[in-house]
Regions:
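A short SAM/SAH-binding and catalytic strip from SAM-dependent methyltransferases
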Residues: 108-121
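C-terminal helical/coil "lid" or tail adjacent to the Rossmann-like core of SAM-dependent
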Residues: 196-249
């Protein structure tokens, strides 16, 4: 398997992400959308919309409404504009969700598997409050406390090994997997009400080694592979990870923990 030889730590491989996330994260997103009764005319921000595959499903729920599909990654924005070109009620915006400047107030802020990339969530929820209409809603799920803990444990050990440690001297953690009580306090501080925050386990098993490897490489290892100098080194890092998983006798699975949020302004 050839790995993308792109050293940009902050840019996603949008086309590959489209393929590998369709079964896992798209299914979670559908179920999250099902938790709300949609009237069809809501004004919505899809915060961290990525390549826009889930935005299509959201657009069908609000055929008379308006969706702002917001993402900070230029590759994802380009892919989203391609994927969503036929949806007249969707506008794709290149912006970080915590700085998005929208022309009208929102009925709903929807987000699936994205908020954990924002480290300052106090400012994030304060900004969300400013974007919403009175009685506007948050409908959100993302990585919570303990998320993919087993995979990260293996990755951290590899980072400290003689083979790879020189490349991670300046590595910085780029995600935040919070506990429910931490987010409840932030929502209260941002003056939200009817707050519901929960943490649920979503262990995800893959059908074969190739599917597992591609998902891990594209999604889980994104904050790490950019620190490695070339494609060969990235391949070695992924292969070492897979070898550790097999040696440990673990199934080809990821122990996802999902933090769910509903709140009203």
């Amino acid at each position: 398997m050839r790995l993308n030889d792109n050293n940009n730590n902050h840019s996603w491989d949008a086309k590959t992400y489209d393929k590998v996330s369709s079964n896992v994260q798209l299914d979670w997103g559908r179920k999250l959308l099902d938790k709300r009764k949609w009237t069809g005319n809501e004004i919505v921000m899809d915060a961290g919309a990525g390549s826009g595959n889930l935005t299509k499903i959201l657009a069908d729920r609000v055929p008379y409404g308006q969706i702002f599909a917001v993402d900070a990654d230029p590759n994802m924005v380009q892919q989203a504009r391609s994927n969503l070109s036929g949806w007249r009620n969707v506008q794709v915006i290149h912006s970080s969700m915590d700085k998005a400047n929208l022309p009208i107030e929102l009925d709903v802020i929807f987000s699936n598997a994205a908020l954990h990339w924002i480290l300052n969530q106090e400012d994030l929820f304060s900004h969300f409050g400013q974007l919403l209409k009175p009685n506007g809603e948050l409908l959100i799920e993302y990585g919570g406390h303990g998320n993919v803990e087993r995979a990260l444990m293996v990755i951290f050990k590899l980072m400290q090994s003689d083979q790879f440690k020189e490349h991670f001297v300046n590595w910085k953690q780029s995600w935040y997997f919070p506990k429910p009580d931490e987010i409840t306090k932030l929502l209260e501080k941002a003056r939200f009400r009817d707050i519901q925050v929960n943490l649920s386990e979503r262990t995800t098993t893959f059908s074969d080694r190739e599917e597992f490897a591609m998902f891990v490489k594209t999604v889980i290892m994104k904050p790490f592979l950019g620190y490695l100098p070339n494609a060969k080194k990235k391949e070695q890092f992924l292969d070492a990870f897979l070898k550790k998983i097999v040696q440990s006798g673990w199934a080809l699975s990821l122990d996802y923990m999902r933090l769910g949020i509903f709140a009203r302004k």
